[in-house]
C-alpha cells in the first residue's frame, strides 16, 4: 500500500513525527506551508493559531506537488490548535479530490484536545472513522520511550500493511 504523510508543523514536533513514521513505513512526505506564516512567539502563536483554527480559516498554501491517484493511504499529521485541526490541513482537504482513500492521522499536542481534533478531521473528510490514530505529547521537545512505542504501534497498524 503506497502512503503519503501530509502534515503541517509549526515548531517541529509534527515534522519530527512525520519523518519517524515515514522512515518506518516507507511513506512519502508532503509538508504544507501557508503563504503567510503563523507567528511562533509564545503568546502570539496561541492567539493567531487558535483563532485561525476556531474560525475554520483556509489559508493559501505555497505550491506543492501531489497526485492523489499515486496513493492508497493518506496520513495526516498536525499540531492541535484549540482542539482543532490546523487551517493549512483544512485548505489541503478542501482543495484535493481524496475520495476512495484510506485515512489515518497523528496529532501532537502540549495539553489536550486531539480527540476533538480527530472528530473535526473526520467531519472535514466526510468519514466515520480513521484507519489509525496516534496522539503524542511534544515528541520532539520532550522525547520519551512512551512516544516511541506509540509511533511503533501506529506503524504496525494493519491498515498500512495490506
Language model regions located:
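Short Gly/Pro-enriched loop/turn and capping motifs at secondary-structure junctions
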Residues: 80-83, 109-113, 138-141
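Short, aromatic/basic amphipathic alpha-helical patches
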Residues: 116-125
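A generic structural motif
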Residues: 31-34, 106-107, 132-138
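N-terminal beta1-alpha1-beta2 submodule of the flavodoxin-like/Rossmannoid cofactor-binding fold
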Residues: 1-76, 83-85, 90, 94, ...
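Glycine-rich phosphate/pyrophosphate-binding loop and the adjoining helix
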Residues: 129-162
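Structural beta-sheet core signal
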Residues: 5, 76, 104-107, 132
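Short, conserved loop/helix-junction motifs that constitute active-site signature segments
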Residues: 94-100, 124-127
